[in-house]
From Swiss-Prot:
Name of the protein this chain belongs to: Signal peptidase complex catalytic subunit sec11
Keyword Lipid metabolism tagged: no
Subcellular location: Endoplasmic reticulum membrane
Function: Catalytic component of the signal peptidase complex (SPC) which catalyzes the cleavage of N-terminal signal sequences from nascent proteins as they are translocated into the lumen of the endoplasmic reticulum. Specifically cleaves N-terminal signal peptides that contain a hydrophobic alpha-helix (h-region) shorter than 18-20 amino acids.
Organism: Penicillium rubens (strain ATCC 28089 / DSM 1075 / NRRL 1951 / Wisconsin 54-1255) (Penicillium chrysogenum)
GO terms under cellular component: signal peptidase complex
Length: 175
């Protein structure tokens, strides 16, 4: 009887250790994300290209690294910005600026698009404000790595499968 109690306590300790390991992995990933956010001064320091509007410069699925510590916006710079009232960030190139108004950039355009983005802006919005609308400037990229996120968005059941596999791996792992 004493040996079965000892075995139960050992199993409970192992289970708790596995759950804590899984929590450690998740919290480490979260801390790394927040650390990148602080260093880059961007709410989203890494984004995935979701459309072909920036081809041939960036393809759908490319992973972009952003930096948002610049105060000026230059023509030709590739920016990621949010349109007020919409939740998906847009990756486009600056084709015109307002030098007379500090911090304001206007007329982004996808390299593969015929027209600029002014039709995408919120009603009565003629420009993008650097402080409010810009998520960051593209400083680097890794081709096709972000395609995993696109697949997870397009096929929600894959998220469940991946989380289940990650949880299973943590639970199976013995130290």
């Amino acid at each position: 009887m004493l040996s079965s109690l000892s075995s139960s306590i050992t199993n409970a300790r192992q289970s708790i250790a596995q759950v804590l390991n899984f929590a450690l992995v998740l919290s480490t990933a979260f801390m790394m994300w927040k650390g990148l956010s602080v260093v880059s001064a961007s709410s989203s320091p890494i984004v995935v290209v979701l459309s072909g509007s920036m081809e041939p410069a960036f393809q759908r699925g490319d992973l972009l690294f952003l930096w948002n510590r610049d105060t000026r916006t230059e023509i030709g710079e590739v920016l990621v910005y949010n349109v007020r009232g919409k939740s998906i960030p847009i990756v486009h190139r600056v084709v015109r600026t307002f030098p007379e108004v500090e911090g304001r950039a206007s007329a982004k355009k996808g390299d593969n698009n015929l027209a600029d983005d002014t039709e995408l802006y919120a009603q009565d919005q003629d420009y993008l404000d650097r402080a409010e609308d810009i998520v960051g400037s593209v400083r680097g990229y890794i081709p096709m790595v972000g395609y995993v996120t696109i697949m997870l968005s397009e096929h929600p059941w894959l998220k469940t499968v991946m989380l289940g596999l990650m949880g299973l791996m943590v639970m199976i792992q013995r130290e």
